[in-house]
A protein has these predicted regions:
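Short, compositionally biased low-complexity segments
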Residues: 1-6, 348-352
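Catalytic alpha/beta active-site cores
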Residues: 2-248, 279, 311, 317, ...
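Intrinsic disorder at enzyme termini
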Residues: 5-18, 34-41, 47-63, 316, ...
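Short, hydrophobic/aliphatic alpha-helical segments
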Residues: 30-34, 297-306, 469-472
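Glycine-rich, charged/polar anion/phosphate-binding loops
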Residues: 35, 180, 269-270, 302-306, ...
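Flexible, glycine/charged-enriched surface loops at secondary-structure junctions
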Residues: 37-39, 227-238, 269-279, 348-358, ...
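Active-site capping/gating regions of soluble enzymes
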Residues: 240-426, 431-434, 563, 568-574, ...
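N-terminal glycine-/lysine-enriched basic segments
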Residues: 290, 322, 326-328, 349-357, ...
Length: 591
C-alpha cells in the first residue's frame, strides 16, 4: 500500500475571486430573464433572505458580536413543583438526573414558601450544585431561606421577573429584588436577576419582537432598581436572560447573538464598561409554542433543532422539555430522551469544541445584524410608548396579533406543522385520553397547534361516540374564530374549481364550538356570554358563583344538551353543500 502523501495547505490561487456583482450577473444569465426576486424568501418577520451571501456583506458589520467564548454549556432539566408541594419528589428526580448527564437543575416553583430548602440542601449541596429557581412572589424570603441552610455559597440563578410576569404591586416587588441582589452580591456564581424572555416566545412572538421586548424589560430594571442599596453596575452584573426557542434554526441562532450585541449597546448607553456586557449569561429553554399533542414524537425533532440553535448561538445553559409534556406528566422515558439530547450534541456531535461556530458565516453575520437592527427598533417603539410596564397593553396586543396571524397561516397551509396540518397520521392512536385532556386546566391553549388539535381531538371523540352508539352529547369549545380557520383548512383540501360560500356569518368576538351528538356533529358559534350561561346550566353552577371558568369540554344527556344549545341561541356555521360531518371527516383524512 502506497504511503499517504504529506498534507499541504490548500490553495485556490488559480481561481479568480468573484465579487457580489459578478455572482449576481451569473444568476441573471442562469435565470434567462426570470425574476430574481423569486429566489428571495420573505419571512413573517419582514426579513428578506437573499439567495446567496458574499464576504462583501460583512464589510461595515460590527465585529465581536459573540463575547462569550465558553463552550461548556450546562444541561439543565426543568422540574415543575406545584402549589403546597414541598418538592421532595422533584428533588429526588433531580438528584438522579445529575448522575445521568444533567449538569444543573431548574425548578419552577408555584409556591416557593412551601419548597423544602433543607431537604434540597441535604440531597443537592447548594454550594456545589448549579440550580435555578423560578418564583413569582417572596423572592427575598426564599433566598434568605437558601442561605440559612448553612451553605458556603450558592451556584445558579433566581428567575423573579415581576415586570414580564405582570406581578401586582411592582414597587414592592422591585424592593424585594433589590434585597435579593444585596444578599447575593458576594456570590459570583449566582445570578439574582433572570429576565423571563421565554414569556414572549411562548406566546408566538416573532424573533424580532422577542429581542425588542426583552430589551424593554431589561431597561425597566436598569432604570428602576439602582438605589442607595444597589448600584447600576451591581444590577447589570446580576443579569441573566432566559429565552424561549422555536424551530426556526438560523433565526434562533441570530436571536441569541443579537441579544448579546444589543445588551452591550444598552450597557454602553448607561456608561458601563465592555466587561459588564461580557458577563451576561443566557439560559435557553425549548418553547411550548411549537410543541404538539398530535404525532408527538415529532417534538423530538423540534427540540433538537431548538437546542442546536441555542448552543450555536452561544447559550450558557439549555433546558430541553420532554416531548410529551403538553399532554401528560413526563415519564422516565421521555425525560431521559430530553436529558440525553444536549449530551449527544456535546459528546457525539462535538458542538462544544468550537467557541463560535457561526462566526464568519456571511448569512448568519448578516442575519444577526438585521435582527439586531429590527429588534432595536421594536425596543425604541416600546420605550416611546412609556416603556414597560406602562406599555404592557401594547406588547400583549402585538403578541396576540402575531399569534392570530400564525393561526391563520397554519389553517391555510402557509405555515406547516408536521403531523398536525400536514402529513397527519389518520390512524394515530392517542397515548392519552382526549376527553380528559380537553377538560384539563393544564392543557396549554396558547400554542400554535392548539386550534388544529382541539378540532382533531373533538372530531375523534365524535366519531368514537357515534361508533359506540353512546346516547350522550358533547359541546367542545374550539376557541375564538376557529370556525373560520376550519373553513380555510377545508377549502385547501378541495379542488380549486369548487366555489363555496358560508350560509351564516361569524360575528367578531364570538366563540366557535362543536356540538356532537350520536347522530351528527355541528359547527356552531356563540357569544362569550351565551357560552358562559350555557356552561353554568350544563355544569349546574349557580349564577352568583364568581370564579367559574367554563371548561373546554361539556357533556350531558342528549335531551339536556339539545335544549340548552337551543335556549342560549347557538347559531350553526355551515359550508354550503357540505355537512359538518363532511368537513370534519375530510379534515381528519377519513374521506
Amino acid at each position: 500500500m502506497a504511503d499517504t502523501p504529506p498534507s499541504s495547505p490548500l490553495s485556490f490561487s488559480e481561481f479568480d475571486s468573484l465579487s457580489t456583482a459578478a455572482w449576481q450577473e451569473r444568476i441573471r444569465r442562469d435565470l434567462k430573464g426570470a425574476d430574481q426576486a423569486a429566489l428571495e424568501w420573505h419571512t413573517p418577520e419582514g426579513i428578506v433572505v437573499q439567495p446567496f451571501y458574499h464576504r462583501e456583506a460583512l464589510e461595515g458589520l460590527p465585529q465581536g458580536q459573540m463575547m462569550n467564548p465558553n463552550t461548556q454549556w450546562l444541561n439543565m432539566p426543568t422540574y415543575a413543583v406545584g402549589p403546597a408541594d414541598k418538592g421532595h419528589r422533584a428533588i429526588e428526580l433531580a438528584a438522579e438526573a445529575l448522575t445521568r448527564g444533567a449538569d444543573g437543575i431548574y425548578f419552577e416553583l408555584t409556591d416557593a414558601a412551601a419548597f423544602d430548602v433543607t431537604f434540597l440542601h441535604e440531597r443537592l449541596p447548594l454550594a456545589t450544585t448549579y440550580i435555578g429557581y423560578a418564583v413569582r412572589i417572596g423572592a427575598a424570603g426564599f433566598v434568605e431561606r437558601l442561605l440559612a441552610t448553612g451553605t458556603a455559597g450558592l451556584r445558579g440563578f433566581l428567575r423573579f421577573d415581576p415586570v414580564t410576569d405582570h406581578t401586582p404591586d411592582l414597587a414592592h416587588q422591585l424592593a424585594d429584588l433589590r434585597t435579593v441582589i444585596s444578599l447575593t452580591r458576594q456570590l459570583p456564581e449566582f445570578r439574582a436577576l433572570t429576565l423571563n424572555g421565554a414569556f414572549f416566545a411562548n406566546r408566538g412572538g416573532t424573533v424580532i419582537q422577542q429581542i425588542g421586548f426583552v430589551l424593554a424589560a431589561a431597561t425597566t430594571y436598569l432604570e428602576q432598581l439602582p438605589s442607595a442599596e444597589v448600584s447600576l453596575a451591581e444590577v447589570a452584573a446580576a443579569f441573566q436572560m432566559q429565552v424561549g426557542l422555536n424551530p426556526n434554526y438560523f433565526f434562533e441562532i441570530g436571536k441569541l447573538r443579537a441579544l448579546r450585541r444589543l445588551w452591550a449597546t444598552l450597557l454602553h448607553a448607561y456608561g458601563l464598561p465592555t466587561e459588564a456586557a461580557q458577563a451576561l449569561r443566557i439560559f435557553a429553554a425549548t418553547s411550548t409554542w411549537s410543541q404538539t399533542t398530535l404525532d408527538p414524537h415529532t417534538n423530538l425533532l423540534r427540540v433538537t433543532t431548538e437546542t442546536m440553535a441555542a448552543v450555536l448561538g452561544g447559550a450558557d445553559a439549555v433546558s430541553v422539555a420532554p416531548f410529551d409534556r403538553i399532554y401528560q406528566s413526563p415519564n422516565e422515558f421521555s425525560s431521559r430522551l430530553a436529558r440525553n439530547l444536549p449530551v449527544i450534541l456535546r459528546e457525539e456531535a462535538g458542538l462544544n469544541r468550537v467557541a463560535d461556530p457561526a462566526a464568519g458565516s456571511y448569512y448568519l453575520e448578516t442575519l444577526t445584524d438585521q435582527l439586531a437592527r429590527e429588534g432595536w427598533a421594536v425596543f425604541q417603539r416600546v420605550e416611546a410608548a412609556g416603556g414597560l410596564p406602562t406599555a404592557i397593553g401594547l406588547v400583549l396586543q402585538e403578541l396576540h396579533s402575531v399569534a392570530q396571524t400564525q393561526f391563520q397561516r397554519i389553517a391555510n397551509g402557509e405555515q406547516i406543522i408536521v403531523g398536525t396540518n400536514r402529513f397527519q397520521n389518520p390512524q394515530e392512536q392517542f397515548d392519552y385520553n382526549p376527553k380528559r385532556l380537553l377538560r384539563s386546566k393544564e392543557f396549554d391553549s396558547t400554542r400554535a397547534a392548539y386550534p388544529s388539535e382541539v378540532l382533531r381531538l373533538a372530531t375523534a371523540m365524535h366519531f368514537q361516540r357515534r361508533e359506540k352508539k353512546r346516547r350522550r352529547a358533547a359541546v367542545v369549545l374550539l376557541g375564538t374564530h376557529t370556525n373560520q380557520l376550519i373553513l380555510e383548512s377545508f377549502l385547501r383540501l378541495l379542488p380549486q374549481q369548487e366555489s363555496l360560500a358560508l350560509k351564516a356569518s361569524h360575528p367578531e368576538g364570538t366563540l366557535s364550538v362543536l356540538f356532537s351528538t350520536p347522530e351528527a356533529a355541528t359547527l356552531m358559534y356563540a357569544t362569550p356570554d351565551q357560552f358562559g350561561h350555557f356552561a353554568r346550566v350544563v355544569c349546574r353552577v349557580p349564577v352568583d358563583e364568581p370564579d367559574f371558568i367554563p371548561p373546554t369540554l361539556l357533556t350531558a344527556d342528549l335531551a339536556t344538551m339539545q335544549e340548552a344549545v337551543s335556549l342560549f341561541g347557538f347559531r350553526e356555521f355551515n359550508v354550503e353543500g357540505y355537512s359538518t360531518e363532511d368537513v370534519l371527516a375530510r379534515l381528519q383524512g377519513r374521506r
